[in-house]
Regions:
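Active-site beta-loop-alpha substructure in enzyme catalytic cores
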Residues: 34-60, 64, 134-198
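Fold-independent oxyanion-binding glycine-rich loops
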Residues: 40-41, 62-63, 98-100, 116, ...
Length: 256
């Protein structure tokens, strides 16, 4: 690819991709949910390029918004959440962005979700490891959008399989995980495992890298470029799983 273009690694099942002059690499499969990953730069930098992507869902890493103070947002000193809502209104899509929220000194890793000009909600990381600087929030959330039911996994919650299991049981069409900096191979491996075990695609977006794991546990898409676009086909499969185990013993009553 020439200068300014983004490379992507795709599954052999897809026959071709397109290189757009705007520098966004789009891989075409069966038409489904078009996802745009922003793995570098701020939201303001991407806000001038959203028309190039024509995506139904835009997923931004933590670098896009950075630090967000609820108090300063309420006082009007900053407008980061408003910027997310405005971008979703202009693009007429769903915008998902990671950020570090501060509520009177309580810092959390969070993900804000907006659709067509409206903030749908903010999801916080629900698990705290070894007394981390970032506090645990409450509740795993699924957002019903025009693009489908999107479940949110915040950062290190990816390490806890119950989060993805909860999203799958509650009917999410896909799990979107916004991470910070990936280790060498741990997070992609976990995304693939949870996609296979829970039966829902896992979209992983972090600094400098994006990945999609399909329900077969395979890497459907991966790219270090920003922004990059992929058409995610909708997949849902159900299987009867039976387990033989000890316990649950009940003796019959006698002497009726």
């Amino acid at each position: 690819a020439g200068a300014g273009f983004v490379k992507a690694r795709i599954s052999p099942r897809f026959l071709y991709g397109k290189l757009f002059p705007c520098g966004i690499y789009c891989v075409e499969g069966e038409r489904g949910m078009r996802i745009c990953f922003v793995t570098g730069g701020s939201l303001a930098e991407f806000s001038d390029r959203w028309q190039e992507a024509q995506a139904e869902v835009v997923v931004c890493g933590f670098q896009a918004l950075g630090e967000v103070s609820y108090e300063r947002e309420l006082r009007g000193e900053t407008s980061l959440f408003e910027d997310v809502a405005l971008l979703s209104r202009e693009a007429k899509n769903v915008v998902i962005g990671g950020c570090f929220t501060d509520a009177r000194g309580m810092r959390r890793k969070s993900v804000v979700v907006a659709e067509k000009g409206r903030i749908l909600g903010v999801s916080d990381m629900v698990n705290r490891i070894d007394g981390s600087l970032y506090r645990a929030g409450a509740g795993v959330k699924i957002y019903e959008t025009a693009a489908g039911k999107l479940g949110i996994i915040v950062a290190e919650d990816l390490y806890f399989s119950r989060v993805a299991e909860t999203l799958a049981v509650c009917g999410a069409d896909a799990a979107v995980c916004v991470f910070e900096q990936f280790s060498e191979s741990l997070e992609p491996m976990l995304a693939r495992a949870q996609a296979f075990l829970c039966g829902l695609p896992v979209l992983l977006c972090g600094y400098g890298y994006a990945l999609i794991a399909d329900i077969g546990g395979k890497v459907r898409f991966a790219s270090p470029g920003s922004p990059c676009v992929y058409d995610l086909e909708r997949e849902q499969e159900y299987h009867l799983v039976e387990t033989r185990r000890r316990g649950f013993y009940r003796s019959g009553r006698k002497g009726f």
